[in-house]
């Protein structure tokens, strides 16, 4: 079950491979995600010291968040992957044009997971082509509905 989707990633990038990573979260972040108070549209993934981090995602704290901590909604969060997956991703990201983008947050076995995608950026004409295809599919569905 998906908590948050990054639909903009599919518009801006060609997703070539997908990986499921664990997230290192604090308790208030999990509660906020369960309440649907997260946003990953501005997020991106970086590699530092053979570790992978999620930067720029926004998780708004609930108003009932604890009084003795100051929640940081856009803090850097560590992603958990197997060592061989990290090495493979590092090799691919160092190639020209590849980047890592968060695709969605979802639950798996009661834990919050982040699906990341190995992606290549789309050019402007590719984005226009995608938009034309989407419009045509919508128009085709409208015609089919009116014909029946």
UniProtKB/Swiss-Prot annotation:
Residues 123-148 are annotated as: Disordered. Its main location: cytoplasm. GO terms for molecular function: RNA binding. One of its GO terms (cellular component) is cytosol. InterPro entries: SmpB, SsrA-bd_prot, SsrA-bd_prot_CS. It comes from the Bacteria. Keywords: Cytoplasm, RNA-binding. It is found in: Cytoplasm. Residues 126-142 have a biased composition (Basic and acidic residues). GO terms for biological process: trans-translation. Disulfide bonds: none annotated. HAMAP family: SmpB (MF_00023). Belongs to the SmpB family. Required for rescue of stalled ribosomes mediated by trans-translation. Binds to transfer-messenger RNA (tmRNA), required for stable association of tmRNA with ribosomes. tmRNA and SmpB together mimic tRNA shape, replacing the anticodon stem-loop with SmpB. tmRNA is encoded by the ssrA gene; the 2 termini fold to resemble tRNA(Ala) and it encodes a 'tag peptide', a short internal open reading frame. During trans-translation Ala-aminoacylated tmRNA acts like a tRNA, entering the A-site of stalled ribosomes, displacing the stalled mRNA. This is SsrA-binding protein. It comes from Burkholderia thailandensis (strain ATCC 700388 / DSM 13276 / CCUG 48851 / CIP 106301 / E264).
């Amino acid at each position: 079950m998906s908590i948050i989707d990054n639909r903009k990633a599919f518009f801006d990038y060609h997703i070539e491979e997908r990986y499921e990573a664990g997230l290192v979260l604090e308790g208030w972040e999990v509660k906020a995600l369960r309440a649907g108070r997260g946003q990953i549209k501005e997020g991106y993934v970086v590699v530092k010291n053979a570790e992978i981090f999620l930067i720029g995602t926004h998780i708004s704290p609930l108003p009932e968040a604890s009084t003795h901590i100051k929640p940081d909604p856009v803090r850097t969060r560590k992603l958990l992957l197997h060592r061989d997956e990290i090495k493979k991703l590092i090799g691919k990201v160092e190639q020209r044009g590849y980047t890592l983008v968060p695709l969605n947050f979802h639950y798996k076995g009661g834990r919050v997971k982040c699906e990341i995608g190995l992606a290549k950026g789309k050019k402007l004409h590719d984005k226009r082509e995608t938009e034309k295809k989407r419009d045509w599919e919508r128009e085709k569905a409208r015609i089919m509905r009116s014909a029946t």
